[in-house]
Amino acid sequence: AITKLAGQALAAGILLLYGIQVLWLPINGVTMLPPSVGQLLTVLIVLVTINAVNFIDGLDGLAAGIVAISGAAFFAFAYLLAVVYGFNRAGAPSLITAVTIGVCLGFLPHNSHPARIFMGDSGSMFLGLMLAASSITLTGQVDPNAISEEKLGPALLPLLLPFAVLAIPLADLTLAILRRIRAGKSPFSSDKEHLHHRIMRAGNTQIRTAGIMYLWTATIAFPVSVSAFAPLWVSAIFAGAMLAFTIHFSRGKSKSFRTLESANRG
């Protein structure tokens, strides 16, 4: 665990070396951060994002699919800033997210259940690093005051987007760390209590479990991204429709599990 953290911190240091760091936060207006605070926050974001993606990599195709969906939501916002608002700095995260999406989509056919190739820690941590780099470049270095107030608002979107895009991995990471600390274990020890394990125990196959988590990722990430270029009421309707479908899909059980339940009752 210490070796992994050291490697992740080194990767964050390389980003800092090339000028990729959080410059300000959209809190109480636009708060310009002192360089030391921005650098510390950058390292923290990198460590959290890398481990969030690494922790979620517990089923065939799960991490690659979630990162592809998260990258798509990031790309929509980055493309808007680069093309519509003309922000030159948004070009780099647009390219990073496009490459990340392509890598994940190309890998998924080989990694979906039953997987023939596994990404392992090195793959999942690299995807986390790519997401962290695009997130910092996109939301930590672009002036939110330039975003139209007719949309979600200049103070909210850059703050909400990274959390929305990574909501599922971050939730799983937080719950896992708290659960293991309460049990007196290392936060990096393994267990079978991740979100995907619980969904499978509820009667879902690996493929259906991955699909459920894909849908929840999209349901949280895409409406926030859409709010950057659509009125809030449009985003709300879009979010409501996605939420209704995702809840309906999540409440179902796989056909094989229903057959097994019927046999047990008989």
Where in the sequence are the language-model features?
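Structural signature of hydrophobic alpha-helical transmembrane segments
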Residues: 29-44, 89-102
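Membrane-embedded alpha-helical core segments of multi-pass
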Residues: 7-22, 41-49, 67-73, 101
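Transmembrane alpha-helix boundary signature
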Residues: 1, 16-30, 79-85, 139-146
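Membrane-interfacial loop-to-helix junctions in multi-pass inner-membrane proteins
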Residues: 1-7, 61
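Alpha-helical transmembrane segments
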Residues: 62-266
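Hydrophobic mid-bilayer segments of alpha-helices in multi-pass membrane transport proteins
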Residues: 5-10, 238-240
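PRPP/pyrophosphate-binding module of the type I phosphoribosyltransferase fold
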Residues: 51, 60-63
